């Protein structure tokens, strides 16, 4: 359905697939790049910093079968971007990690997700769905004003001396 809409309105579908290994429901993620019927409308992006928890590594990729888009992206990248040599060497090495790395990280994230969801569901009025992938979730909190609540968290609340805030 998304592919049909994108094709009929000449739109792009952008898939950030940096967390594709972190799917908990048992079904593998179907990459947008697999949709052969919309080669000009699909863009897949990935990033080392998200995929491997390599904070600060400013290196990633953009993938598309749209030759015009890729030609323009390459021009921009050649003129504006420069990844540090050390980041390139370290990032290349990260792609040699085996599947056991992602299995261990996936299990840790799943444990954390399950804990957060269980604790949130103990709070009256909180509504949240259990995420099927990645490591973040959206929750509706029983507050009248989200801005005031966030300010209160930053100025008046702590958990054992630690500040608690929204990302």
Where do the PLM segments sit?
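PLP-dependent class I/II
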Residues: 1-167
């Amino acid at each position: 359905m998304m592919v049909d809409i994108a094709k009929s309105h000449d739109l792009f579908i952008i898939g950030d697939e940096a967390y594709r290994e972190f799917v908990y429901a048992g079904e593998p993620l179907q990459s947008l790049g697999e949709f052969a019927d919309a080669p000009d409308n699909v863009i897949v992006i990935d990033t080392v910093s998200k995929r491997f928890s390599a904070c600060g590594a400013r290196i990633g990729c953009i993938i598309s079968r749209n030759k015009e888009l890729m030609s323009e992206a390459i021009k921009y990248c050649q003129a504006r971007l420069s990844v540090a040599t050390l980041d390139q060497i370290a990032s290349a090495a990260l792609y040699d990690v085996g599947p056991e790395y992602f299995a261990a990280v996936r299990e840790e994230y799943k444990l954390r997700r399950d804990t957060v969801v269980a604790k949130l569901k103990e709070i009256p009025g909180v509504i949240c769905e259990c995420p099927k992938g990645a490591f973040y979730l959206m929750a509706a909190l029983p507050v009248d004003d989200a801005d005031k609540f966030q300010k209160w968290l930053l100025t008046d609340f702590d958990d054992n001396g630690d500040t608690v805030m929204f990302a």
